[in-house]
């Protein structure tokens, strides 16, 4: 029998909610995962989001993320202009796992400071990535880039997060940096509120079918220890 780990909620879970939980693992041994830890789980630590005020590149130029609408066209790295299928947002206290990551201008080829949720995956690219992981471009969670200098977690006040969904998982341009759109992986999809899941299922009815394969990520996703190895490679 294979190991299994998951969560079952008896009430809807919304962005910013936290859950204190005790683990039950179907195994004599704990999960071997560098990123795994017992304790508090937060929606915003699973679902990738852009903070209000983020400029997103469209065919007509930069548009604030809060001004995008279903039907808006957004530039993507792989497939050119793509249509926004769904947008979600939520206001939360900027503390703990809900506190945003601030990426200073220039740190990731971004023209201005970029604010994203901690698990939002950014693109790192170059010869080192290709040598170490076989791909010129890879995804890394924003929080794995934190260096207490150009990339920091900023606590205090409130933050409004937005997530953008396309037909496929895409790489888009946020403040000039390459970042992911919302990926309908099992964890991120299950972490959305019930109402949001129902809206998305209306757009993608195949998600209700048993055995449906969820879409792959647009690039390989690195674990934290892999990100650190890449960042410190000589």
Language-model segments: which ranges?
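Sequence-level preference for short, compositionally simple segments enriched
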Residues: 1-51, 57-59, 63, 159-234
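Long beta-strand-rich cores associated with HINT superfamily self-processing modules
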Residues: 51-58, 75-196
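Structural motif
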Residues: 66-73
């Amino acid at each position: 029998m294979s190991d299994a780990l998951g969560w079952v909620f008896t009430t809807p879970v919304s962005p910013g909610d936290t859950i204190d939980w005790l683990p039950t693992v179907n195994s004599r041994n704990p999960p071997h995962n560098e990123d795994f830890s017992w304790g508090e789980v937060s929606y915003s630590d699973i679902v990738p989001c852009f903070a209000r005020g983020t400029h997103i590149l469209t065919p007509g130029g930069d548009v604030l993320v809060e001004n995008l609408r279903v039907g808006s066209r957004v530039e993507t790295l792989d497939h050119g202009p793509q249509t926004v299928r769904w947008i979600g947002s939520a206001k939360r206290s900027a503390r703990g796992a809900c506190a945003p990551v601030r990426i200073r201008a220039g740190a990731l080829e971004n023209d201005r400071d970029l604010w994203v949720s901690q698990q939002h995956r950014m693109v790192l690219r170059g010869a080192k990535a290709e040598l170490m992981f076989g791909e010129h471009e890879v995804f890394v969670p924003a929080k794995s880039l934190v260096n207490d200098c150009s990339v920091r977690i900023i606590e205090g006040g409130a933050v409004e997060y937005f997530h953008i969904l396309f037909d496929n998982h895409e790489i888009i341009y946020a403040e000039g940096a390459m970042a992911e759109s919302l990926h309908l992986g099992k964890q991120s999809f299950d972490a959305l509120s019930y109402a949001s899941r129902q809206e998305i299922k209306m757009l993608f009815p195949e998600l209700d079918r048993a055995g449906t394969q969820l879409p792959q990520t647009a690039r390989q996703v690195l674990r934290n220890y892999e990100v650190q190895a890449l960042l410190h490679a000589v």
